[in-house]
């Protein structure tokens, strides 16, 4: 029984897809356990970029099984489009499995997402308007439609009529918006269900059978710990649990079967949308990092907010996700800076604190306390070991590991697979 969970430790966009793709080479099953098509991940293979939103990164290994678990909310329209995209690129999807217990995102979820966001005015949380939150709301309210329901014509029709009647009352009475028509949704989405039917199964059986047989299973999270609905910067969070604990709920695999948790982070910090960001940069250094790091959302295209590495955030993520190994990405983006900074603590009303406050009001008053390190001017994109790095870059990597309190297993100096360097195999000693 061998399993590894990959989680983002910041606000998403840490390079989880790249690391999952890298670790997939030694895995036999790769599974997603939460989120939806609001999260994008980019994989570079032979200098060609592939952008995915729903399908696990492991799909590019045709001999390995890729799983969309029950904790994922699936937009069938987006999924069919993504399948067509992969087929057009010559990628087989015969190795894909989709949980029959996963919930479905429908047009009324997306419409409600937009209406709710617009109604917030200046208090918007920066949702991607993909219907993720409303779909999870329906799931919690026990009125959601699951993949198993989508495949049954009569069941789907009955539940769609009930849900649509309720949502239309909401649209008309509360938001003064036009209702949606049953006929505009039913046939289209039922057909999407038929197109994905070949992939649908009880994925908890596949995952547990694989683990019981001693196979290596890799779990791929979406977003990041700081976007977790319980442990993140609430309410500026997603509607699911990206933390490692979300694996057990979102995949149907018990906690006793999880061996290691790899936390993925960048050598700096970024986030999309609104919400607290203590180390955010508003100067030329921030602009430089954004442009060199190509910090624009995979899903939205929005410019990401960027800032210095925050070890307070990272220690919070380590604690709530039980991180055992760290993968440090995008070190190359910091090349050329005279000085690099790491936030080691916060100043809250004149008092030094080492924890991440839950209160948004306290976070607004938190000022980062920085440790400054000398930068490096060398191009490090061809470095293939820690010893290859310039001394200052090497010291930066080591200091990050010390402050977070987790050993660094891999570090990357660019987007390519060959630019990911192993310091310690996460598959060993399990």
From Swiss-Prot:
Residues at which Mg(2+) binds: 13, 40
Catalytic reaction(s) noted: IMP + L-aspartate + GTP = N(6)-(1,2-dicarboxyethyl)-AMP + GDP + phosphate + 2 H(+)
Binding annotation for IMP: 13-16, 38-41, 128, 142, 223, 238, 302
Subcellular compartments: Cytoplasm
Similarity comment: family membership: Belongs to the adenylosuccinate synthetase family.
Protein name: Adenylosuccinate synthetase
GO cellular component, one term: cytoplasm
Residues that hold substrate according to the record: 298-304
GO BP field: 'de novo' AMP biosynthetic process; IMP metabolic process
Entry note: cofactor: Binds 1 Mg(2+) ion per subunit.
Residues binding GTP: 12-18, 40-42, 304, 330-332, 412-414
UniProt pathway annotation: Purine metabolism; AMP biosynthesis via de novo pathway; AMP from IMP: step 1/2
Cofactor(s) needed by this chain: Mg(2+)
């Amino acid at each position: 029984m061998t399993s590894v969970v990959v989680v983002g430790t910041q606000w998403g966009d840490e390079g989880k897809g790249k690391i999952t793709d890298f670790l997939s080479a030694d895995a036999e099953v790769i599974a997603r356990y939460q989120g939806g098509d609001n999260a994008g991940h980019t994989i570079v293979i032979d200098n060609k970029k592939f952008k995915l939103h729903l399908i696990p990164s492991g799909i590019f290994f045709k001999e390995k099984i890729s799983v969309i678990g029950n904790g994922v909310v699936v937009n069938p329209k987006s999924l069919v489009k993504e399948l067509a995209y992969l087929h057009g690129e010559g990628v087989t999807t015969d190795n894909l499995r989709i949980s029959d217990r996963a919930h479905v995102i429908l047009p009324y979820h997306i419409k409600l997402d937009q209406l709710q966001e617009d109604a917030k005015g200046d208090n918007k949380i920066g949702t991607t308007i993909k219907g993720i939150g409303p779909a999870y709301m329906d799931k919690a309210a026990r009125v959601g439609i699951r993949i198993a329901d989508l495949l049954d014509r009569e069941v789907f029709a009955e539940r769609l009529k009930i849900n649509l009647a309720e949502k239309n009352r909401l649209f008309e009475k509360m938001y003064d918006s036009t209702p949606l028509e049953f006929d505009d949704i039913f046939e289209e989405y039922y057909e999407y269900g038929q197109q994905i039917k070949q992939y649908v199964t009880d994925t908890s059986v596949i995952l547990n059978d694989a683990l019981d047989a001693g196979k290596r299973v890799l779990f791929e999270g979406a977003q990041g710990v700081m976007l977790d609905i319980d442990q993140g910067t609430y309410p500026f969070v997603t509607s699911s649990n990206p933390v490692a604990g979300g694996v057990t709920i979102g995949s149907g695999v018990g906690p006793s079967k999880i061996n290691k948790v790899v936390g993925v982070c960048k050598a700096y910090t970024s986030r999309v949308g609104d919400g607290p960001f203590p180390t955010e940069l508003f100067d030329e250094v921030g602009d430089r990092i954004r442009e060199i790091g190509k910090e624009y959302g995979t899903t939205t295209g929005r410019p990401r907010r960027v800032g210095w590495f925050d070890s307070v955030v990272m220690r919070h993520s380590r604690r709530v996700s039980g991180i055992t190994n760290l993968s440090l990405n995008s070190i190359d983006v910091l090349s050329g800076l005279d000085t690099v900074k790491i936030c080691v603590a916060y100043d809250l009303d004149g008092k030094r604190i080492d924890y991440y406050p839950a209160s948004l009001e306290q976070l607004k008053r938190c000022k980062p306390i920085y440790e400054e390190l000398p930068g490096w001017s060398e191009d490090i994109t061809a470095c293939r070991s820690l010893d290859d790095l310039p001394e200052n870059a090497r010291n930066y990597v080591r200091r990050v590991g010390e402050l977070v309190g987790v050993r660094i297993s891999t570090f990357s100096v660019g987007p390519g697979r060959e630019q990911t360097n192993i310091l310690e195999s996460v598959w060993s000693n399990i």
